[in-house]
A protein has these predicted regions:
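Short, Lys/Arg-rich, polar N-terminal cytosolic tail immediately upstream
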Residues: 1-8
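C-terminal ends of transmembrane helices
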Residues: 62-75, 120-131
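Membrane-interface helix caps and helix-loop-helix hairpins in membrane proteins
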Residues: 100-105, 125-134
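Divalent metal-coordination and catalytic microenvironments
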Residues: 18, 62, 83
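Conserved small/polar residues in nucleotide/adenosyl-binding loops
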Residues: 137-143
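The first (N-terminal) embedded transmembrane alpha-helix
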Residues: 14-31
Length: 146
């Protein structure tokens, strides 16, 4: 899909919405971490930090990818990074659920499984950016529901 360029931005709608989400994620990080720090278990801070970092990385990658149109090689790398960060955010979203809500061995085991699947998704997108959605989804279960 070709986008009409406005002010030199490759995809203004996505660049703006993801840029706003990036700002909100950065602004929301400190209050969330301060709230987590009030909990007696320090695992809350770790889990929330992982979640917030994964969200910041996704929106940063997406904002950069949708904003700049440098050249073919750079654009392909930005697209790969943008797509890889989807797996990171999904695993980052599971992390607080696994470590806080489920806690214990079950939570840790599920968290490890989810992050292993996310690493699989990252590797698939790193080496096969245009892989069919069906193949990608099966390779990265349980983290991806594209």
């Amino acid at each position: 899909m070709k986008y009409i360029r406005k002010n030199g931005i490759k995809d203004p709608g996505s660049a703006i919405t993801h840029g706003i989400a990036l700002i909100l994620a950065v602004v929301g990080t400190l209050p969330l971490l301060l709230k987590a720090a009030r909990e007696p278990d320090h695992l809350h801070v770790v889990a929330m930090a992982v979640f917030m970092l994964s969200m910041i990385l996704l929106y940063l990658a997406s904002t950069v990818y949708h904003t700049f149109d440098v050249n073919g090689k750079v654009n392909r790398r930005l697209k790969k990074f943008d797509h890889m960060m989807i797996s990171v955010l999904i695993a980052g979203s599971y992390t607080p659920i696994c470590l806080i809500a489920l806690h214990g061995r079950t939570g840790i085991a599920l968290c490890a499984l989810v992050w292993a699947a996310a690493i699989g998704g990252i590797l698939v997108k790193a080496f096969w950016i245009n892989c069919p959605t069906v193949s990608y989804t099966h390779l990265t279960l349980p983290t991806n529901r594209e």
